[in-house]
Design a protein with these regions (language model features):
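PRPP-associated nucleotide enzymes
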Residues: 13-279
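Single conserved hydrophobic/aromatic residue that forms the stacking wall/gate
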Residues: 1-15, 19
Length: 279
């Protein structure tokens, strides 16, 4: 069987979203028969934060524009609540955070720079098994460009912070390359709870924000200051694009799961299965 190389594009045109209670049959037709009871449509907010490509449109919401708005809200929060920090340059942790980071720099009126070379043969570190593997992979995945960090107060912007190991390692690398101060901003709120709807996220106890304050997280990752996006601002970043959607699946931030089968026993069993035995 001959397959096209991975870089070969599959051209398509946007048609519509496939919603709950809908399927596409083998002939390519959209079947709108009622398959399950009527439920409130709650898109996963993490799609807009991280998983979806920026050129995607989900539920009539542009992922790119939603990330621009995340940067707007994050920049406003820094200006209003963190007036003590003096930022020389904003640098994204590639790749997903680029859009938000550019908007943060615009809001703050400072330079935006690319500060990392990325090895694209290393996968997503937050789903890798084993802390040693993750630490090694971060060092292999990102290589700092020293001239962008040396003798500067740097604001690093990432889409989210999961275990905190990646953020901690990146901050250490940046300091090693001469940064005077390292501030860290997350385009999403603290991730405090595990995901049960398809994202292979760590067990709750492995999440850096679980049972930690913002100050404790800041100290753990070694940042001079840590700024998180507010949950309401994140929701607005998406809902401005489609006001018809009023609820989102945001349980990783709130612990409020939208299905009744997600009980405490279910979560405990899931925790056991996901426990990272390689640590």
């Amino acid at each position: 069987i001959r397959r096209p190389p991975r870089s070969t594009p599959l051209y398509s045109s946007a048609a519509s979203d496939v919603y709950k209670r809908q399927i596409i049959d083998s002939a390519g037709a959209l079947d709108k028969k009622r398959l399950v009871r009527n439920v409130v449509h709650q898109p996963c907010i993490f799609e807009y934060v991280y998983f979806s490509r920026p050129d995607s449109t989900l539920d009539e919401i542009s992922v790119h524009k939603s990330r621009l708005r995340m940067g707007d809200f994050l920049g406003d929060k820094i200006l209003n609540e963190y007036k003590n920090i003096d930022v020389d340059v904003v640098i994204p942790v590639p790749d997903t955070s680029r859009t938000s980071a550019m908007q943060v720099a615009y809001k703050l009126g400072v330079k935006y720079r690319e500060g990392f070379m990325k090895n694209r043969y290393i996968g997503r570190t937050f789903i890798m098994q084993g802390q040693n593997t993750r630490k090694k992979s971060v060092a292999q995945k990102l290589n700092p460009i020293e001239i962008e960090f040396k003798n500067k107060n740097v604001l690093l912007v990432d889409d989210s912070i999961v275990r905190g190991h990646t953020s901690k390692k990146i901050i250490q690398m940046v300091r090693k390359h001469g940064a005077k101060k390292v501030y860290f901003a997350s385009a999403s709120p603290p991730i405090r709870y595990q995901n049960v709807f398809g994202i292979d996220m760590p067990a709750t106890k492995e999440l850096v924000a679980h049972n930690r304050t913002i100050r404790q997280i800041k100290n753990y990752i070694g940042a001079d200051e840590l700024i998180y996006q507010d949950l309401e601002s994140l929701r607005l970043s998406a809902s401005i694009g489609n006001p018809k959607i009023t609820e989102y699946e945001d349980s990783v931030f709130t612990g409020n799961y939208c299905d009744s089968y997600v009980t405490k026993d279910y979560l405990n069993n899931l925790e056991k299965r996901r426990k990272d035995v390689s640590r």
